[in-house]
């Protein structure tokens, strides 16, 4: 499949039942809703997908279910996150054989690699597969920062094609463009920096809280890339109160609860995560319900959307 590297690629949750078993039917239904809302691709097994709680065979089942649900309409991107490079290479090959359209690759977990080690990890995994790869940079969560200078060195690796930029510093997008030009597709990776990222030239958005608000998420991006900023601002101000849920250590529980309250899935998570209780639950529900009850009328994007790069 030729991947349209642009616009909204939701980072899907992995749906579970109360007993923590996989609910692949619910996962498939949620994927269907995201495609219907206009998603250009779907990302499986990321942080929101609770990758670390899944056994290898479960990961394969989740991606296989996503491929079946997408049915060739949008690309399925499988996330590769392992503690060692050898395991990451093997999983990348597994996903290619399974039929994933692309990969999103994280640095190796637990050990905090230095820049040379990090770049070798990305080079080695990229050599193990023909699939195109999104490089995920999230130093706040994973304690390894892939800097613009490092991406300039990695630019010679042909199947490292995109960057999910989640440093939380929107200046990084400009620094990346200055360092590597248009060599990589740039995805916004932080929900409450989506509009700012679009204005600074991000090509797409790997979205989180939009799982509960898919139409609003898509329209916000459409307005942003069409530079309809005046129309986008009221929607973004409403959306940002919800998007802040994506920046907390419990973002998985928060977003899954929002998905449940929106009628698009269930909040069940896998231990050590637990569903929210008591005052925290009441506080987050208040934010979610305020968003649901205050949904604005969606403005139309008047200008044509920019063509794909």
Give the location of each predicted region.
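Catalytic alpha/beta core domains of metabolic enzymes, predominantly
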Residues: 127, 139-247
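Short, amphipathic alpha-helical "lid/cap" segments that border enzyme active or binding sites
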Residues: 24, 28-31, 148, 281-288
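Alpha-helical structural signal in soluble globular domains
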Residues: 37, 61, 65-70, 94, ...
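Short secondary-structure transition/capping segments
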Residues: 54-57, 90, 115-118, 146-148, ...
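Structured C-terminal cap/extension of enzyme domains
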Residues: 195-309
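Active-site beta->alpha loop and helix N-cap motifs at the rims of alpha/beta catalytic domains
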Residues: 2-10, 15-143
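Catalytic cores of TIM-barrel enzymes
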Residues: 2-4, 184, 259
């Amino acid at each position: 499949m030729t991947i349209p590297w642009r616009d909204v690629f939701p980072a899907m949750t992995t749906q579970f039942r109360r007993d923590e078993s996989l609910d692949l039917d619910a996962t498939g239904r949620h994927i269907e809703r995201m495609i219907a809302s206009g998603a250009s691709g779907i990302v499986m097994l990321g942080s929101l997908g609770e990758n670390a709680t899944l056994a290898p065979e479960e990961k394969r089942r989740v991606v296989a279910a996503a491929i079946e649900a997408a049915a060739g309409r949008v690309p399925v991107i499988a996330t590769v996150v392992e503690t060692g490079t050898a395991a990451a290479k093997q999983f990348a090959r597994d996903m290619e054989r399974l039929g994933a359209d692309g990969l999103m690759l994280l640095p190796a977990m637990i050990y905090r690699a230095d820049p040379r080690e990090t770049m070798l990890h990305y080079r080695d995994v990229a050599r193990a597969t023909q699939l195109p790869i999104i490089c995920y940079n999230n130093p706040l969560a994973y304690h390894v920062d892939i800097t613009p200078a490092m991406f300039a060195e990695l630019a010679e690796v042909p199947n490292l094609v995109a960057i999910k930029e989640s440093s939380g510093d929107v200046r990084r997008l400009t620094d990346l463009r200055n360092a590597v030009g248009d060599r990589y597709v740039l995805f916004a990776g932080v929900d409450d920096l989506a509009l700012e990222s679009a204005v600074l030239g991000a090509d797409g958005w790997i979205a989180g809280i939009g799982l509960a608000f898919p139409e609003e998420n898509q329209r916000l991006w459409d307005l942003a890339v069409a530079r309809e900023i005046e129309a986008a601002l009221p929607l973004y101000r409403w959306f940002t109160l919800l998007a802040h849920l994506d920046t907390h250590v419990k973002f998985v529980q928060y977003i899954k609860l929002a998905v449940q309250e929106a009628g698009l899935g269930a909040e069940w998570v896998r231990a050590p995560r637990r569903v929210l209780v008591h005052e925290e639950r009441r506080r987050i529900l208040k934010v979610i319900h305020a968003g649901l009850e205050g949904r604005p009328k969606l403005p139309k994007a008047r200008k044509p959307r920019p063509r794909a790069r």
